[in-house]
Amino acid sequence: MSDVENQPFFNIQRVYLKDMSLEQPNSPAIFLEQDMPSVEVEVDVKAERLAESVFEVVVSGTVTAKVKDKVAFLIEAKQAGIFDIRNIPDEQLDPLVGIACPTILFPYLRSNIADAITRAGFPPIHLAEINFQALYEQRLAQLQQQAGAAGAPNGTTLN
């Protein structure tokens, strides 16, 4: 094999909106409310190996806005990407898939959610940046804690 074939390779094959739903259970009455809504945001990351060097990474976001105890809207979206990753050492592969790939996908998710919210007739909500490295490290710590409690072997990966 030549040196070129052994070089680390990272390529975005595709970025796509995998799933999105928006519910407005209290429309149109909710539009008459004068109080500011409270907003809850949840984000999650999942990854799946599709082939030897091909991974699908999905960043999911859920935004719930409530006025008093009434739901103004609930939006759930999944932004996905297919990544071709080759010749990356195993110890670097999991962080690449768990940190770098979600960081690439999140701006698309944020834009799609903001667009859907405004198209639904609500003022825009802009999701703050997310530190996917901190999220990854938090999940890794949880897995290590679970592995220690269950007596699982070391080397368990997130993806």
From Swiss-Prot:
One of its GO terms (molecular function) is unfolded protein binding. Its main location: cytoplasm. One of its GO terms (cellular component) is cytoplasm. It comes from the Bacteria. It is found in: Cytoplasm. Coiled coil: none annotated. GO terms for biological process: protein folding; protein tetramerization; protein transport. HAMAP family: SecB. Belongs to the SecB family. This is Protein-export protein SecB. It comes from Burkholderia vietnamiensis (strain G4 / LMG 22486) (Burkholderia cepacia (strain R1808)).
